[in-house]
């Protein structure tokens, strides 16, 4: 299969992932460079012709969030001015997704602002994974392909025989029940829910309140879309252990892991935390309890399907995991 009119570029956030995606597709990464001037301004240079090409930019808006977002916008502008046929952004992790509504008076809806900026810059399509709020897709007037990480996480546990009635998939809050139910369908397990109350005085902290469902004598698998400071997931794991769980595993699509996250995980009842590589983790963050699995095959398949105008629906098939 020839991909002579397909180009994949990497910016600063996920270079290793981009290399693996390019290998999956069977192409070379596009030649570009990013530099930052002493005053903080960013300059992006495209170092090959992309006239008439269908271009994909791979970049997560993880930390440093604002720099990574601005790199995308500048790159899109450069590609449009260089006569790219189409510009598609592959954003494995969509930053600002937690600011998807007005929770209090006079708050912004920043995830909508990000959508507006991407569209105004000239993005033709967005490919992303496990948005914190799925309805963010509705903030866009361009096509949004929203992939799921659950099949990859399910495959990890299934390969280790962690299926059936001895296991229970646990959502750390009410908002993640749909995600937990999906993983439970893959693994043929029951589900449980942690009922927690988040502190209104301190950001990124939460208090575990109650466990809904049977976990005593079971191996529990927690699943969330993202783990930030890891307070929620660690408190949930400790509560499950106190309730009689034999072992507690945890999983998420987006390992933000900011601040004291790795220390919290190390001290918690979590035996293993399984994460995807939507966000690059430096060596000091990859502690023994954390195992990272790659989304390169999933993204490569999705990019090829988009380029060839084939449906992405097979990537969501419960009976046919990635």
From Swiss-Prot:
Coiled coil: none annotated. GO terms for cellular component: cytoplasm; ribose phosphate diphosphokinase complex. D-ribose 5-phosphate binds at residues 198, 224, 228-232. ATP binds at residues 39-41, 98-99. Its cofactor is Mg(2+). The keyword Magnesium applies. Involved in the biosynthesis of the central metabolite phospho-alpha-D-ribosyl-1-pyrophosphate (PRPP) via the transfer of pyrophosphoryl group from ATP to 1-hydroxyl of ribose-5-phosphate (Rib-5-P). This is Ribose-phosphate pyrophosphokinase 1. It comes from Streptococcus pneumoniae serotype 4 (strain ATCC BAA-334 / TIGR4).
């Amino acid at each position: 299969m020839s991909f002579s009119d397909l180009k994949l570029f990497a910016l600063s956030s996920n270079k290793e992932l981009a290399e693996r995606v390019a290998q999956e597709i069977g192409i070379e990464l596009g030649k570009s460079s990013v530099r930052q001037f002493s005053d903080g301004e960013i300059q992006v240079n495209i170092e090959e012709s992309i006239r008439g090409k269908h271009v994909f930019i791979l970049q997560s808006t993880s930390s440093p969030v604002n720099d990574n977002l601005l790199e995308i916008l500048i790159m899109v502008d450069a590609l449009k001015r260089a006569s790219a046929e189409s510009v598609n952004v592959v954003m494995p992790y969509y930053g600002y997704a937690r600011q998807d509504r007005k929770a209090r008076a006079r708050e912004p809806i920043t995830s909508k602002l990000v959508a507006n900026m991407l569209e105004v810059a000239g993005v033709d399509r967005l490919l992303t994974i496990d948005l914190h709020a799925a309805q963010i897709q509705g903030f866009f007037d361009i096509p949004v392909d929203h992939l799921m990480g659950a099949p990859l996480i399910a495959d990890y546990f299934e390969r280790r025989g962690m299926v059936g009635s001895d296991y229970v998939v646990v959502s750390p809050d009410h908002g993640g029940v749909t995600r937990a139910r999906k993983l439970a369908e893959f693994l043929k397990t029951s589900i449980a829910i942690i009922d927690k109350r988040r502190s209104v005085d301190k950001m990124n902290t939460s208090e575990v309140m109650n466990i809904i469902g049977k976990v005593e004598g079971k191996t529990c698998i927690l699943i969330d879309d993202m783990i930030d400071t890891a307070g929620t997931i660690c408190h949930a794991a400790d509560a499950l252990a106190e309730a009689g769980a034999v072992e507690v595993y945890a999983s998420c699509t987006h390992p933000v892991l900011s601040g004291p996250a790795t220390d919290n995980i190390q001290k918690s009842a979590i035996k293993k935390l399984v994460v995807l590589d939507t966000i690059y983790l430096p060596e000091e963050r990859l502690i023994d309890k954390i195992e990272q699995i790659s989304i390169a095959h999933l993204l490569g398949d999705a990019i090829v399907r988009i380029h060839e105008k084939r449906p992405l629906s097979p990537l969501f098939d419960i009976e046919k995991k990635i």
